[in-house]
Amino acid sequence: MELYLDTANVAEVERLARIFPIAGVTTNPSIIAASKESIWEVLPRLQKAIGDEGILFAQTMSRDAQGMVKEAKHLRDAIPGIVVKIPVTSEGLAAIKMLKKEGITTLGTAVYSAAQGLLAALAGAKYVAPYVNRVDAQGGDGIRTVQELQALLEMHAPESMVLAASFKTPRQALDCLLAGCESITLPLDVAQQMLNTPAVESAIEKFEHDWNAAFGTTHL
């Protein structure tokens, strides 16, 4: 599987990359806007933080296919190897098809249904990103959407993969992986929740207490 961080916070990427076996970083326009930095300044810094082998994702802003393709080429020229995120609208599907012919790797984003995700994959997107928590918030079942999409891709578009996004809890992320999802991207707060387990700290403190009581030190 592949684990990504969904952020434009370079310092946090550097910190968590030392801990997590991350494959790269995903961003979107809202994440970039929240960073208060120009996309052309923050993307190179993020790429440096994840290393040459790390995969970086950034999204186009245009609403029409030709504009999406133009922006995708601009992103590719700025960051060779970048994966361009394209919203899965009718214009987005047209752009994904054109970018496939141009050799630019894409991710179909803003996916709210398995059918929508399958169309993105068939159009040529290497990655498809269902929005798990947002589907739940609209009264749907985000995990079931991932299960259905994963099954559809395995049958009809095996060269594409699910990269699930939009998580509020570690449980949602784990349920996606149990559903067969190959990749997930975690916001910083969810990634941190995976690390913060009070019971673990209590167990370690007990070990230290017992060891110190017996040997007068907390080291070997």
Curated annotation (Swiss-Prot):
Localization terms from the record: Cytoplasm
Location of the active site: K85 (schiff-base intermediate with substrate)
Catalysed conversion reaction: beta-D-fructose 6-phosphate = dihydroxyacetone + D-glyceraldehyde 3-phosphate
Annotated Gene3D superfamilies: Aldolase class I
GO biological process: fructose metabolic process
EC class: lyase
GO CC terms of this entry: cytoplasm
Keywords on record: Carbohydrate metabolism, Cytoplasm, Lyase, Schiff base
Gene Ontology molecular function terms on file: fructose 6-phosphate aldolase activity
Stored InterPro entries: Aldolase_TIM (IPR013785), F6P_aldolase (IPR023001), TAL/FSA (IPR001585), Transaldolase_3B/F6P_aldolase (IPR004731), Transaldolase_AS (IPR018225), TSA/FSA_arc/bac (IPR033919)
Entry EC number(s): 4.1.2.-
Predominant location: cytoplasm
SUPFAM superfamilies membership: Aldolase
NCBIfam families according to UniProt: fsa_talC_mipB, PRK12653.1
Quaternary assembly: Homodecamer.
Function, as annotated: Catalyzes the reversible formation of fructose 6-phosphate from dihydroxyacetone and D-glyceraldehyde 3-phosphate via an aldolization reaction.
Family statement drawn from the similarity comment of this UniProt entry: Belongs to the transaldolase family. Type 3A subfamily.
Protein name as annotated: Fructose-6-phosphate aldolase 2
UniProt source species: Escherichia coli O6:H1 (strain CFT073 / ATCC 700928 / UPEC)
